[in-house]
Regions:
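Alpha-helix-loop-beta-strand connector modules within alpha/beta enzyme cores
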Residues: 125-142, 212-237, 278-282
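Histidine/acidic-residue-rich catalytic or RNA/ligand-binding cores of hydrolases
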Residues: 75, 120, 150-152, 207, ...
Length: 423
């Protein structure tokens, strides 16, 4: 049986490679893959025709920083201790499905913030095998962290040590010491992780720490990175403090998440070493582009930290904007939008002066490189998966354009689309 042919007529066309929108291009899809692309491409008689001449066609988008294991950001903390692991796995399925409907054909899960298990690997594999529908998942089920750290949600029970101690045991990658973390890396690789995630500093979401607080010592981080590299996998770190970012670079980390308190010296080190950063602008946008009403919607400690670090966040955003750091597009929504509404990050990048092409490239080509799947997706090229999205709103002038996907195809199959609930 011959593979299905699909002929796509593009209005505007962005391939993820060149910083331009081309007009009048066509894409021929054969089965799962892009077969041919060009302005003068003829349509085979047997091909199904999809007319997107009134839309901008792009690669399927990629969100490089998601936490998929909750249903609603308003109740994320309650879900951590009130939902079963089975229910948390269902939330991952739902997030993957909704992300795909929004034009994001691949997502990266940066560790469970409610879940303690490995349900995300089951969902990842089931999607890959075609058993269920959803965005392709690249995942670390758990992050490596220390007691009392940003990754230790038993901070909520710090006033009840007996309960905190019992709950802490459920987090098998939460501990201390070089040998503990060497073993943790080996176990996560054994269980099927796609990469290693560590919590190097405190954060904004957790109640009892600071984003400048060092939460893994140099011996621990060096051991984690070395062990991961020996096993052929990569490491990324949740981190804010410039001194910690510099230390991680010296220890040859592959990339980092957030980096919102960036300074010039640290940015230069990123540039010189080719270390990537997924800056997750949106969670701090209410402080950078000050909006007291939106800040008031966040959890109390998040509000307080945004107010306290507002000036540093503004300065850090500008350092990132003017740098030549390799930047990925990721959302990290736990306190302002639903985790599958990845298009909100586009608004944050555009409002920060990043420009449409820099943002689109981060969400396509660069993200595919960060995730290690650039040979399969991220750009529109013959031989790659037919991961294709289309948008009817103007990507150059409409900051909310990525919240309203008009068409999505993943591996040659067309799926229904769904706009954000917030537009």
């Amino acid at each position: 049986m011959s593979e299905k042919l699909t002929y796509i007529i593009c209005g505007k066309y962005y391939d993820g490679i060149e910083d331009e929108f081309k007009s009048g291009w066509k894409i021929l899809v054969k089965g799962k893959y892009i077969a041919e692309i060009g302005p003068n491409l003829e349509c085979p008689e047997s091909a199904e025709v999809i007319d997107l001449s009134d839309a901008t066609v792009t690669p399927g988008m990629i969100d490089a920083h998601m936490h998929m294991d909750y249903f609603d950001w308003h109740t994320v903390r309650q879900e951590a201790y009130h939902n079963s692991e089975e229910m948390k796995t269902i939330s991952i399925i739902r997030s993957a499905n909704k992300a795909l409907k929004r034009g994001f054909t691949t997502v990266r899960h940066l560790g469970g913030i409610t879940s303690n298990g490995y349900g995300v690997f089951a969902v990842r594999d089931a999607i890959e095998k075609g058993y269920i529908t959803g965005a392709r998942i690249i995942a670390a089920a758990k992050f490596l962290c220390s007691p009392g750290s940003h990754g230790d949600l038993t901070q909520e029970f710090a006033g009840y040590p007996q309960a905190a101690s019992l709950l802490q045991k459920e987090r098998t990658t939460l501990g201390s010491g070089r040998d503990f973390f060497i073993n943790a890396v080996r176990e996560e690789v054994k269980y099927g992780t796609d990469f290693i995630k560590i919590m190097a500093t405190g954060g904004f979401f957790t109640p009892n720490d600071s984003p400048l607080q060092k939460q893994l010592n140099d011996e621990e981080t060096a051991a984690i990175i070395r062990t991961a590299h020996e096993l052929g996998t990569t490491v990324t770190a949740h981190v804010y403090a410039p001194d910690q970012m510099q230390s991680l670079i010296k220890n040859h980390i592959d990339g980092m998440e957030h980096g919102a308190l960036m300074d010039q010296e640290t940015a230069q080190m990123f540039e010189e070493t080719g270390t990537y950063l997924v800056p997750t602008f949106c969670p701090y946008d209410e402080a950078v582009h000050y909006d007291a009403e939106k800040i008031a919607l966040k959890q109390p400690e998040f509000r307080a930290k945004l107010e306290y670090y507002k000036d540093a966040l503004i300065a850090g955003r500008e350092e990132i904007r003017k740098s030549n750091i390799i930047l990925g597009y990721g959302t990290d929504f736990v306190a302002n939008h639903q985790n599958y509404d990845s298009g909100w990050e586009y608004d944050a990048w555009m409002r920060s002066g990043m420009g449409a092409f820099r943002t689109l490239k981060a969400a396509t080509k660069t993200n595919s490189e960060i995730l290690g799947i650039a040979d399969k997706t991220g750009t529109l090229e013959p031989g790659k998966f037919a991961d294709i999205a289309a948008w009817k709103r103007d990507l150059t002038t409409d900051n909310l354009a990525l919240l309203d996907c008009a068409f999505v195809m993943k591996e040659g199959i067309v799926y229904e689309t769904e706009p954000s609930d917030e537009i």
